[in-house]
Amino acid sequence: MRARDDGQDRRDHERSHGATLACLFAATLGVGCLRDLGDTDSIFYDGDGRSVHCAVDLDRKSDLSHANLDAALDRAAARGEVVEIYAHNPERTVAVADIEYVVKGAAERGLAFVTYADFARGSGTGPGLALSFDDTSIPGWYDLRSLFDRYGARVTFFISRYAQIYGNERAMVKQLAADGHDIAAHTVNHLNGPSYVEEHGMTAYLRDEVLPSIEVLQADGYEVTAFAYPFGARTEEIDRELLEHIPVLRSVTFPRSGVVSPCPE
């Protein structure tokens, strides 16, 4: 067996020490410790054909270090899995530099760029990165075109409130699709699904929030094969109903100890 080099031992020690200090600080704030993404199984797709996927948030509030992102990308490369990561508004909620760090890191490791349409077709196999963006930050996404082109990246845009988007921004979405990116649904009004179902019923949730968000995109020519839950909020009952209408669902994982994730176990 090859002996570990001293430099690697030192880096591992520093990483472990840094994680310990971060957990102690988190405890003083009353929040859970951030887990190593490389040990967060729910964000890795291993080709098992699942219909409900889970991604981890890249936004600043998640406080993911580059070392933690490296751990996730390294695992995907080593095990032939697809790591799922999402974000929202470039610059406002997530630094463009962090987006580039992930995309560049995937390219350097030889990871394929996988969309949720690929998952729906059964072709989303690893090693790979499934990067997605939620909500309506279309101009910000559009400004990432050169970055994506530089690394040959393909991503998925889960768009909410599409019926309220007009003119130039719809043209931007068309161009993003023409570039090879996936356009998917994210509800009409970005409401919490389980709360809506509890108050109004399942039929109303499908009628008011889910199906129109799919149909309005289809009317503009997009083959919509995936749906992302706002806030990742879901139940098995809602999953079953939605999977009658669309093949792939995306929730989220909260990678902190003591914090309950909506991701299926």
Where would I find each of the regions flagged by the language model?
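C-terminal motif of bacterial Sec signal peptides marking the signal peptidase cleavage site
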Residues: 30-32
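N-terminal regions that are enriched for targeting/export leaders
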Residues: 113-122
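Catalytic grooves of carbohydrate-active enzymes
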Residues: 51-109, 219-220
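Metal-dependent polysaccharide deacetylase catalytic core of the NodB/CE4 family, i.e.
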Residues: 35-36, 50-54, 80-93, 120, ...
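Sec-dependent N-terminal signal peptides
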Residues: 21-27
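Bacterial N-terminal signal peptides that target proteins for export
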Residues: 10-21
